[in-house]
């Protein structure tokens, strides 16, 4: 890990953020690495609302990230909302940076147990469904969809061109 690493973690749940902050600080202590961990509690609604502010006010400095990883969120959101978030995230990725979003595939062998025993309902997406969430400004050749070894978890990877 490089010395100039800054991690910004965003979630709507304060307990989740505190748990991750503590875990990363423990790793930082044990490894002797120096990196910054910032957490921010925001809802999806807040992210979307805040993304409109720069266009209105024009005075907010735009932050850029080398890597944005959105996991465990799109399984609960409509295609429309996911596309909005992907556009926002893509705008925040620095030229040459990587945006990754995950979703569970419909072939999940635990799907029925999750739904009927645990009342845990997800919005499942196939690889073409996930590909359809591509940000509007992202070139088609800049993305790919991969799966983990189980084939259940899909990853939409979008590399922003170095020229922006």
Residue spans for each PLM region:
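Helix-to-beta-strand junctions that scaffold the AdoMet/dcAdoMet cofactor pocket
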Residues: 77-78, 93-94
């Amino acid at each position: 890990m490089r010395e100039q690493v800054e991690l910004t973690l965003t979630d709507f749940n304060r307990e989740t953020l505190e748990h991750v902050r503590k875990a990363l600080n423990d790793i930082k202590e044990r490894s002797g690495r120096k990196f910054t961990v910032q957490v921010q509690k925001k809802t999806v609604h807040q992210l979307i609302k805040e993304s409109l502010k720069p266009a209105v006010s024009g005075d907010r400095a735009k932050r850029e990230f080398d890597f944005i990883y959105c996991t465990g969120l799109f399984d609960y959101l409509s295609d429309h909302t996911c596309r909005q978030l992907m556009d926002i995230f893509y705008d925040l990725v620095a030229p040459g940076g990587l945006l990754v979003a995950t979703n569970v595939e419909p072939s999940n062998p635990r799907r029925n147990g999750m739904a009927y025993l645990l009342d845990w309902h997800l919005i499942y997406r196939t690889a073409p469904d996930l590909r359809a969430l591509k940000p509007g400004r992202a070139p088609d050749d800049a993305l790919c969809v991969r799966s983990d070894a189980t084939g259940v978890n899909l990853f939409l990877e979008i590399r922003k061109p170095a020229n922006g």
